[in-house]
Amino acid sequence: MNENDDSGDVLDHLEWVKSPSLSHWTNHRLIEARQLIYETTGELYDTKRLQMLPLDERFGMWVLSDGRKDYGIFWAMKLNKQTARVLAFSISTDLQGKGFGAQGWSTFALAAKNLGIKRVQLEVRQDNTPAIRLYHRRGLRPRGYITGFYRGHDGWLMMGPLRVQASSQ
């Protein structure tokens, strides 16, 4: 395949890579991330608000990228000494179900575990069955019900041990 040929399979060139600080992102890149979050969760954020997220630069700033465009984001913060909170985990809808979510989770979890993080929590739309299944296989369980958390949709607060790989459950 010619490196300059855009007709090649984008899947072959995607990988989860560390992201620079959002304060260094261009406005165009922020708008694309905002759109990705909106398309996958229904949440709409101001780009300035995104730049203010307290992301942990050591384990909580990842993008699924082909080197030119972002197709996914995984953003997390340190909640306390041993707990991380996932703030955003979105993958382009046409790439969902292809293993990129599991790869993104493992990338984040390995980096966080190496820094002493032992637990993780997040919020997820109650109707996002594939994501809930991914989290459940990694030991997270619903710990609270969030009414109206996502514009017209309820959510779950999920918590559990931080696992790099899925269990067989």
For each of these PLM feature ranges, what is it?
Residues 1-10, 152-169:
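Terminal substrate-recognition subdomain of acyl/acetyltransferases
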Residues 9-94, 102-107, 111, 115, ...:
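Acetyl-CoA-dependent GNAT
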